[in-house]
């Protein structure tokens, strides 16, 4: 999904049944996703991506793989998050499997730390679906469980 870089920038958030999703957009790319306790006063609630999130939470399959994200992270971590984007809807993988998908050695302590750090510091969870990895992630555990439940039904 290409966002209009001339007009699509800002903070957008919406409350869903069990949690709030906040997205930050700059230059037509998603630069941040968080799950605050409430919709911030300065956040707009109308955004096409939030509409897609609503449909997804209602059970409509959406891989979000067309959503352009800005990943300003080290190269090794970028490869991990790009591999995470390729984990199919409704599936989960181990940290070890994700390391292999990212071209890293899951037996190497440094490579394993790279994977775990990338997942914990993922700036755009949901669009880089760390909830599909059995291990650490930027998505809060309760939200991750809900997202996995949505994808398994």
Q: Predicted regions span which residues?
A:
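Nucleic acid-binding interface residues in structured DNA/RNA-binding domains
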Residues: 63-153
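Basic nucleic-acid-binding alpha-helical/helix-turn surface characteristic of O6-alkylguanine DNA
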Residues: 1-105
């Amino acid at each position: 999904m290409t966002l209009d870089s001339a007009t699509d920038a800002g903070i957008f958030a919406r409350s869903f049944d069990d949690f709030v999703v906040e997205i930050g957009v700059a230059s037509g790319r998603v630069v941040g996703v968080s799950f605050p306790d409430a919709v911030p006063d300065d956040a707009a609630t109308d955004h096409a991506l939030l509409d897609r999130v609503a449909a997804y939470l209602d059970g409509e399959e959406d891989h979000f793989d067309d959503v352009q994200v800005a990943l300003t992270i080290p190269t090794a971590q970028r490869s991990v998050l790009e591999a995470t984007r390729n984990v199919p809807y409704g599936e989960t993988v181990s940290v070890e499997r994700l390391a292999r998908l990212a071209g890293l050695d899951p037996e190497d302590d440094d490579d394993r730390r790279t994977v775990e750090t990338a997942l914990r510091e993922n700036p755009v969870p949901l669009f880089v679906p760390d909830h599909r990895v059995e291990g650490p992630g930027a998505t809060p555990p309760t939200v991750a469980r809900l997202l996995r439940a949505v994808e398994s039904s």
